[in-house]
Design a protein with these regions (language model features):
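Periplasmic-binding protein-like
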Residues: 1-9, 87-126, 145-158
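Flexible hinge/capping segments at coil-to-helix
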Residues: 10-30
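Short secondary-structure boundary segments
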Residues: 11, 34-35, 79-80
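Short helix-initiation/N-cap motifs at beta->coil->alpha
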Residues: 15-18, 52-66
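Hydrophobic residues within well-ordered alpha-helices
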Residues: 23, 64-68, 109, 122
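Short amphipathic alpha-helical coupling segments at ligand-binding clamshell hinges
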Residues: 26, 78, 114-128, 134-138
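Ligand-binding clefts/hinges and TM-proximal coupling segments of bilobed small-molecule sensing domains
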Residues: 35-52, 93-95, 126-158
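A ligand-binding cleft/hinge motif common to bilobed small-molecule-binding domains
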Residues: 40-44, 68-69, 73-103
Length: 158
C-alpha cells in the first residue's frame, strides 16, 4: 500500500482548484513543519510561496489548525493524517479539488545492508499478501478512516 500527500485548504476556499501552480506565489502561505516532508515538498514544488514554519516535533494537527484558522492558506498533508483530523474536525479543511496527490510513497521496511536474500523473501511474501487481498483486509480493519491509504493496483484485473 502507499501513503500520499495532498494539498489541503480551508473549507470553501476554491482559489487553487484545478490549478495548484497558483500556490507558488509569495502572497500565499504554506504551513510546514521543519524537517517534516511538507517542508521539502514546499521547497521543491512551491519555492516562491511564503512559509509558516513550525519547529520540528510540532504535531501535524497544528498545520491543519493554521490553515483552518487562516494563518496559512495551504497545508501539505499525508492523506491518512488529514483524514483523521477531518474525522475529529469535520468541515474545517478540504483537499484541493482536481489536484492529484503531490507525492506518493510506497510503504517499505529498512533492512541491514547486504540482506538481499531476506529482502527477496519479504518481497515475495508481501506480493502474495497483496494479491490475495490480505493487505486490503488488514487496512480496512485498522485504518482510522476508511481509504486513507492508497491501495496497490493488481497487475491482472477481471
Amino acid at each position: 500500500f502507499y501513503s500520499g500527500m495532498q494539498l489541503f485548504v480551508r473549507s470553501g476556499d476554491t482559489r487553487f482548484d484545478d490549478n495548484v501552480g497558483k500556490i507558488n506565489n509569495p502572497r500565499y502561505r504554506i504551513a510546514t513543519i521543519d524537517g517534516e516532508m511538507s517542508s521539502f515538498v514546499q521547497a521543491s514544488d512551491f519555492p516562491k510561496a511564503s512559509v509558516l514554519s513550525m519547529p520540528d516535533g510540532t504535531d501535524i494537527s497544528m498545520a491543519c489548525e493554521s490553515v483552518a484558522d487562516g494563518k496559512a492558506d495551504v497545508a501539505i498533508l499525508d492523506k491518512s493524517y488529514a483524514a483523521l483530523y477531518l474525522k475529529r474536525n469535520p468541515g474545517r479543511l478540504r483537499a484541493v479539488a482536481g489536484a492529484r496527490p503531490i507525492r506518493i510513497f510506497e510503504n517499505t521496511w529498512a533492512l541491514a545492508y547486504g540482506s538481499a536474500r531476506l529482502q527477496e523473501m519479504l518481497n515475495v511474501a508481501v506480493k502474495t499478501m497483496v494479491y490475495s487481498g490480505y493487505v486490503d483486509k488488514v487496512l480496512k480493519k485498522y485504518e482510522a478512516v476508511p481509504n486513507s491509504f492508497y491501495r496497490a493496483a493488481l497487475p491482472i484485473m477481471q
